[in-house]
């Protein structure tokens, strides 16, 4: 889970699946890495629909007042990444606790504004790529 993509998947036995069956991700879910490379964020692609989530990442569930695409860009922003670095535990193996994610300061504009911001930024990214 890096650079808005998922690679290097491992497979588990049916026995393990029964134990962790509640920790799955679906197509279009938002994920954030919480151990190893901390703070990478992305949206689950269709080919990983139903995949199991490890302890190195969390699934983020949003209410209907938050535009998913805008929220991913916000989490990837330097402002939010700085907050993530500040709240990551640094003793032993660095880790980003769920409680710390819940406490991140999110500047939440109205939904229509979120969509407009995402659309504008996405157009700029398209322009940069060409």
Residue ranges, per PLM feature:
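A short glycine-rich beta-alpha junction/loop motif
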Residues: 37, 50-58, 66-69, 89-111
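Amphipathic alpha-helical coiled-coil/heptad-repeat segments
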Residues: 83, 87, 103-130
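Sequence-specific dsDNA recognition surfaces
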Residues: 1-27, 47
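Interdomain signal-transducing alpha-helices
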Residues: 71, 75, 114-117
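Short amphipathic beta-strand starts and helix->beta connectors
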Residues: 44-46, 87-90
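Short, conserved catalytic or interaction motifs in soluble domains
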Residues: 36, 46, 62
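Short Ser/Thr-interspersed hydrophobic loop/turn segments at strand-loop and sheet-helix junctions
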Residues: 1-3, 23-40, 53-57, 72-85
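Conserved aromatic/hydrophobic "specificity hotspots" at molecular recognition or selectivity sites
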Residues: 60, 64-65, 120-124
């Amino acid at each position: 889970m890096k650079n808005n993509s998922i690679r290097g998947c491992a497979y588990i036995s049916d026995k393990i699946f029964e134990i962790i069956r509640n920790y799955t991700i679906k197509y279009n879910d938002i994920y954030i890495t919480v151990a190893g490379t901390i703070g990478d964020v992305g949206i689950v692609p269709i080919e990983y629909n139903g995949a199991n989530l490890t302890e190195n990442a969390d699934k983020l569930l949003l209410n209907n007042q938050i535009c998913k695409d805008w929220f991913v860009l916000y989490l990837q922003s330097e402002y939010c990444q700085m907050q993530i670095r500040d709240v990551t535990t640094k003793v032993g193996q660095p880790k980003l606790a769920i409680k710390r994610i819940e406490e991140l300061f999110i500047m939440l504009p109205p939904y229509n504004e979120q969509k407009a911001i995402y659309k504008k930024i996405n157009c700029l990214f398209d322009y940069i790529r060409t």
